[in-house]
Swiss-Prot record:
<feature type="glycosylation site" description="N-linked (GlcNAc...) asparagine">
    <location>
        <position position="712"/>
    </location>
</feature>
<dbReference type="GO" id="GO:0036060">
    <property type="term" value="P:slit diaphragm assembly"/>
</dbReference>
<feature type="domain" description="Fibronectin type-III 5">
    <location>
        <begin position="435"/>
        <end position="531"/>
    </location>
</feature>
<keyword id="KW-0677">Repeat</keyword>
<feature type="domain" description="Fibronectin type-III 1">
    <location>
        <begin position="50"/>
        <end position="124"/>
    </location>
</feature>
<dbReference type="GO" id="GO:0050807">
    <property type="term" value="P:regulation of synapse organization"/>
</dbReference>
<feature type="topological domain" description="Extracellular">
    <location>
        <begin position="30"/>
        <end position="822"/>
    </location>
</feature>
<feature type="glycosylation site" description="N-linked (GlcNAc...) asparagine">
    <location>
        <position position="227"/>
    </location>
</feature>
<dbReference type="GO" id="GO:0042803">
    <property type="term" value="F:protein homodimerization activity"/>
</dbReference>
<comment type="similarity">
    <text>Belongs to the protein-tyrosine phosphatase family. Receptor class 3 subfamily.</text>
</comment>
<feature type="modified residue" description="Phosphoserine">
    <location>
        <position position="865"/>
    </location>
</feature>
<keyword id="KW-0325">Glycoprotein</keyword>
<dbReference type="GO" id="GO:0072112">
    <property type="term" value="P:podocyte differentiation"/>
</dbReference>
<keyword id="KW-0378">Hydrolase</keyword>
<feature type="domain" description="Fibronectin type-III 7">
    <location>
        <begin position="631"/>
        <end position="724"/>
    </location>
</feature>
<dbReference type="GO" id="GO:0016791">
    <property type="term" value="F:phosphatase activity"/>
</dbReference>
<dbReference type="GO" id="GO:0090260">
    <property type="term" value="P:negative regulation of retinal ganglion cell axon guidance"/>
</dbReference>
Length: 1216
């Protein structure tokens, strides 16, 4: 035997063999058998052999691959059979025989199909089918799953004396529900076989597994009896006395033939499962003879049974109801007056519903839950009669049992139980079957609640209110805060007392009549709201932490404290209550928590609530709050500089993330304390101050951050100011031997030292000791007559000398020289003449100013309409302009400058430059004049500005490829001044961006005015920033204003870098103020990196101007940008939305701020005209044009104030 193909012979025979499989269908006879060990044995018969030279091959298919086997070569005897070990049990295999003579097929082949036997079931479990144990079972079988194939399961069993078998296929994971058996039947010898089936050539093969598991047996539950009912009959007294001697002492009942009165009772209680009780071996037979009655019977029918509920209440009954001591007064009087006469109980029922196999009934009679009688009757009995010899509460139940066969005896499920009460007087009391309805709770206070309910029955005489705490068991015993209702407490009062605030309770109501108690009501759950905390206190621990402490009520139950805080969150820009911490409840009456990581100088509101265990949770109380403003952090003085008697102080506050815009910081208090104490209050947005301090003193400098409720002071900075030299030193009262020196003290000085020495003598003469004086005058004596001296006065403060102040003095000669008298007279006359000349000049100056106001400041004449084309030489124009600058500003008009500006040239509108210089000393009067008649003269000037640049071309902006790059179709860049991008793309328009160069105070391309980027142009915008090496971007708009998009958000939202084309932008830092924000960007392109500052002014309305009160804010912003620009290279990029209105106003203010620093005149008209010749519509509205004038007025006012503060006059003393 061998496998094919093998070696050379296998290769030689493979192709004919495959051809044979396709060609032939007829068969040669051969024999195939399947052994028990799953081996397939294939053997040749004598009739199969054609010649010993032929090759016989077997092909076996059925598994994932085909197998080929070759019979061994043989001569006179048949070859041994081929044995194939099948891997699968229960799988069909196809065996094909092929005969090959040499390389030629000489005999057709044929196929035989065999089916292997599946592996048997190893174990079986049978369970009741809980929804229907009378007819249903759950089968669970276990069998080998690997390599085991079957289609159905054969179930065999004996049903009583009948043998049954069936094929079942609805097994899932070895389990199935079979719901077709008979109730109460014993099913024995239950076995399971796996069945495998296969169909081949219209024939079906079937194989059964063996049975290797232990046979099982199972009895289904019988149905319970039907229509169980009982009647109670009062026996005739005489009959009872005759038979009283036959009562068994050990039993509370016996049989009785004589029947007195009978009554019909209706019991509707469900019966619990019958417990094992004492079976009475001497139970009397029931009597089925005729009964003598004295009244119409009343039947208790069980058809209207109530749900099973009485057994649930057994464990919660009060102890007082477990014996007969709880009988009513009527019952007690009855039992005291009469002896109990037994009553007759007649119990009847009907057989269970067919088909049910049963062998009898079990009767269970229970009295007072302590005494039990348990007996059995056959299947023919349907009535049971017994005498009840003792009063009490009785419970009856009847069940069906089945015992025939080899299975265990089994009872039916419990049917309905019947309950009633027999009083000592023989009176029966019907069981209560209705539960209370509409149970509700009304909480009267934090410790009291009132229960209410409704009931249709009126035959109950009391109620039981059962209360239990649901929260008590949720607490650890060591931390338990309540004791009263941890176990169930019963009461007959509708009012529940001694409740605990915060606890949750469950209440059940029962109706009671005598010892009988009805079914419970639906449970009602209610909770008592906690009373909340008390004495909430706050203790600050610095700028960023506080401690909260509080006490809780002595009486109360809760799960946890929840500490919340309310504040403005600068990260989310919202204010809301957030939970900070939760503290588990303890028995301690006090609690505290430390709250850290607070923002300094910030308003907080803290709240502590008590949360209960209930579901849902209750909390109290929102009024337990306390507010607080944290202290600011201490500022840090960073620089102190002193010059010109002014001390310049700078400081920082917090770190880069500290937010002042939303804090409760009010102002800074800068204090310099020396011999004098100088204070200055500084607004919170400014961190610099200038103090005018007298020199010569030692000062302790401090900066205090002040809020509404607290402050924090920086570390003291010691500053020692050197004493200043005396001011205005004079020599008076000169004599031949003495001179008096007089000076003015400058700053603080402890004393002054005076020295005098002779001039021009080889022998230096000076005072033996310096004269130290504390006053401002000293007389130097013992001088030589007619001698010149150099005297000096030095201030001393804190042992430090100042720079000495010198004066040359000469003593008087002994006799008066006549020439001196003449010279003195001439000097006096000259002084009078000079004074008269000064008075005359002052009068002329006033008249000149009056003439300037009358002629009208800023008047200009438009010669644009004149048809004249004349040009003057350049030198002439310079001379004219130089001459005009000498005239009063009221004469600086377009009329006089007509030849200089040359409006009649060929390119007049393009090159025309309107101008109107104004002296700053006259600027206030100029503004008043221009603002007359509703800003009429401003309107005239602005109308002239509209003519600038009308004929300047902008062809690139009109190209079809570039139109989509323009935010507004009427704001287009001029070709001659537009910014051109460097692009590798040679496509037309690739270099276009809506931006123009604007000349500045320092450079002809100091600014780039551009529109707010669009989503399509943000990449071009960053390319322009990189190529122009711009380090400052000024954004004068918000991305969205009045629900309209004004500009794309072209920078990253977070610190995560974002790629804009080939350029990556990363936001390094961001700082926001009330009116602006400063951002630091880092842009990267290949190996090139550049830092860019982004200044965003957010308080500027579109097409408008900031309010008059906000003018100082915008000037401060312009000054801040200018300070940064002096440190930067490349043009500043300025944009708003269109890039003309707010952009032009900002550029004008920045240029004027620099111009006024160095000059005392301005030409606003000429400046705006020049900007409009480089980009259209710069300074877009008349309001913006007027706003520039108002800002210039403010600039000049501040410059004059600075001059007044720093104007320290030193008088030079001439030589005598």
């Amino acid at each position: 035997m061998g496998h094919l193909p093998t070696g050379i012979h296998g290769a030689r025979r493979l192709l004919p063999l495959l051809w044979l499989f396709v060609l032939f269908k007829n068969a040669t006879a051969f024999h195939v058998t399947v052994q028990d060990d799953n081996n397939i044995v294939v053997s040749l018969e004598a009739s199969d052999v054609i010649s010993p030279a032929s090759v016989y091959v077997v092909k076996i298919t059925g598994e994932s691959k085909n197998y080929f086997f070759e019979f061994e070569e043989f001569n006179s005897t048949l070859p041994p059979p081929v044995i194939f070990k099948a891997s699968y049990h229960g799988l069909y295999y196809i065996i094909t025989l092929v005969v090959v003579n040499g390389n030629v097929v000489t005999k057709p082949s044929r196929s035989i199909t065999v089916l292997t036997k599946p592996l048997p079931v190893t174990s079986v479990s049978i369970y009741d089918y809980k929804p229907s144990p009378e007819t249903g079972v759950l089968f669970e079988i276990h069998y080998p799953e690997k390599y085991n194939v079957f289609t159905r399961v054969n179930i065999s069993y004996w049903e009583g004396k009948d043998f049954r078998t069936m094929l079942y296929k609805d097994f899932f994971k070895g389990k199935t529900v079979f719901n077709h058996w008979l109730p109460g039947m014993c099913y024995s010898n239950i076995t399971f076989q796996l069945v495998s089936e296969a169909t081949f050539n219209k024939s079906t093969l079937v194989e059964y597994s063996g049975v290797s598991h232990e046979p099982k047996q199972h009895r289904t539950a019988p149905y319970p009896p039907q229509n169980i009912s009982v009647r109670i009959v009062n026996l005739n007294k005489n009959n009872w006395e005759e038979q009283s001697g036959n009562f068994p002492e050990e039993s509370f009942m016996r049989s009785q033939d004589t029947i007195g009165k009978e009554k019909l009772f209706h019991f509707t209680e469900e019966t619990p499962e019958i417990p094992s009780g004492n079976i009475s071996s001497g139970w009397p037979d029931f009597n089925s003879s005729d009964y003598e009655t004295t009244s119409q019977p009343y039947w208790w029918d069980s058809a209207s049974a109530a749900p099973e509920s009485e057994d649930e209440f057994v464990s919660v009954l009060p102890m007082e109801y477990e014996n007969n001591s709880t009988l009513s007064e009527t019952e007690k009087s009855t039992s005291g007056s009469f002896s109990f006469f037994p009553v007759q109980m007649i119990l009847t029922w009907l057989p269970p519903k067919p088909p049910t196999a049963f062998d009898g009934f079990h009767i269970h009679i229970e009295r007072e839950e302590n005494f039990t009688e348990y007996l059995m009757v056959d299947e023919e009995a349907h009535e049971f009669v017994a005498e009840l010899k003792e009063p009490g509460k009785y419970k009856l139940s009847v069940t069906t049992f089945s015992s025939s066969g080899s299975c265990e005896t089994r009872k039916s499920q419990s049917a309905k139980s019947l309950s009633f009460y027999i009083s000592p007087s023989g009176e029966w009391i019907e069981e209560l079957t209705e539960k209370p309805q509409h149970v509700s709770v009304h909480v009267l206070s934090s410790t009291t609640a009132l229960m209410s309910w409704t009931s249709s029955q009126e035959n109950y005489n009391s109620t039981i209110v059962s209360v239990v705490s649901l929260t008590c068991q949720k607490q650890k015993e060591s931390q338990r805060l309540e004791k009263q209702y941890c176990t169930q407490v019963n009461s007959s009062k509708p009012i529940i007392e001694n409740l605990v605030p915060g606890a949750q309770y469950q209440v059940v109501i029962y109706l009671r009549k005598g010892p009988l108690i009805g079914p419970p009501s639906d449970p009602v759950t209610f909770a008592i709201v906690p009373t909340g905390i008390k004495d909430l206190m706050l203790y600050p621990l610095g700028p960023t932490a506080v401690v909260l402490s509080w006490t809780r009520p002595y009486l109360g139950v809760f799960r946890k404290y929840v500490v919340e805080m309310f504040y403005f969150n600068p990260a989310t820009m919202t204010s809301e209550w957030t939970t900070y911490y939760e503290i588990a409840a303890t028995v301690s009456l006090t609690a505290s928590v430390r709250i850290a990581n607070l923002l300094p100088a910030w308003y907080y509101n803290f709240r502590v609530t008590m949360v209960t265990w209930g579901d849902p949770e209750l909390s109290c109380c929102d009024s337990s709050t306390i507010s607080f403003i944290t202290a600011p952090v201490a500022p840090e003085i960073t620089s102190v500089e002193y010059f010109n008697s002014l001390l310049y102080i700078s400081w920082t506050y917090g770190d880069d993330t500290t937010d002042l815009s939303h804090s409760r910081m009010l102002h800074w208090m800068v204090v310099a304390e020396g011999k004098k104490k100088i204070k200055k209050s500084v607004t919170r947005n400014v961190m610099t101050a200038i103090l005018s301090l007298p020199p010569g003193d030692i000062y302790n400098l401090s900066v205090t951050a002040c809020t509404e409720r607290g402050s924090n002071t920086s570390m003291l900075r010691l500053v020692k100011l050197e004493p200043a030299p005396p001011k205005s030193l004079f020599a008076v009262n000169k004599t031949q031997t003495s001179v008096t020196l007089l000076w003015v003290e400058e700053g603080v000085a402890d004393f002054f030292e005076v020295f005098c020495q002779q001039v021009g003598s080889s022998q230096k003469t000076k005072l033996q000791e310096p004269v130290a004086v504390s006053s401002h005058v000293v007389t130097i004596s013992s001088l030589l007559p007619a001698t010149a001296y150099n005297c000096s006065v030095t201030s001393f403060s804190h042992d430090s000398p100042s720079v000495p102040t010198f004066i040359a003095v000469s003593t008087m000669v002994t006799e008066m020289n006549p020439n001196v008298v003449v010279i003195s007279v001439l000097a006096i006359l000259s002084t009078l003449l000079i004074g008269l000349l000064l008075v005359t000049l002052i009068i002329l100056r006033k008249k000149h100013l009056q003439m300037a106001r009358e002629c009208g400041a800023g008047t200009f004449v438009n010669f644009a309409s004149l048809e004249r084309d004349g040009k003057l030489p350049y030198n002439w124009r310079r001379s004219i302009f130089a001459f005009l600058t000498l005239l009063p500003s009221c004469l600086w008009t377009d009329y006089l400058l007509a030849f200089y500006i040359n409006p009649w040239s060929k390119n007049g509108l393009k090159k025309r430059k309107l101008t109107n210089p104004v002296q700053l000393d006259d600027f206030d009067a100029y503004i008043k004049d221009m603002a007359k008649d509703s800003d009429y003269k401003f309107s005239l000037q602005f109308e002239e500005l509209k003519l600038i640049g009308l004929d300047i071309p902008h062809f690139a902006a009109d190209l079809p490829l570039n139109r989509c790059k323009n935010r507004y179709t009427n704001i287009l860049p001029y070709d001659f001044s537009r910014v051109r991008l460097v692009s590798m793309n040679e496509e037309e328009g690739a270099d276009y961006i809506n931006a123009n160069y604007i000349p500045g105070y320092n450079s002809p391309q100091e600014y780039i005015a551009t529109q707010g980027p669009l989503p399509e142009t943000r990449n071009d915008f960053w390319k322009m920033v990189l190529q122009q090496k711009s380090q400052i971007i000024v954004m004068l708009t918000q991305c969205n204003e009045k629900r309209r998009v004004k500009c794309d958000h072209y920078w990253p939202f977070t610190e995560e870098p974002i790629a804009y084309g080939d350029i990556t932008v990363e936001m390094i830092s961001e700082e926001e103020q009330d009116d602006w924000a400063c951002r630091h960007f880092r842009i990267n392109y290949a190996d090139e990196m550049q830092d860019v500052m982004h200044f965003n002014y957010t308080a500027w309305p579109d097409h408008g101007v900031p309010t008059a009160n906000a003018a100082e804010s915008i000037l401060q912003f312009v000054h801040m940008v200018r300070q940064q620009a002096t440190k930067s290279k490349g043009p500043m990029i300025i944009h708003c939305s269109a890039g003309v209105g707010r952009t032009g106003t900002f550029i004008a203010l920045d240029r004027l701020l620099q111009h006024i620093r160095d000059h005392e005149f301005v030409d606003i008209l000429g400046l705006v005209s020049e900007m409009r010749s480089y980009r259209m519509s710069m300074v877009q509205t008349e309001e913006q044009y007027i706003f520039i004038h108002q800002c210039v007025q403010l600039m000049w006012m501040k410059k004059k104030q600075q001059f007044c503060i720093s104007d320290v006059i030193y008088e030079n003393v001439s030589k005598s």
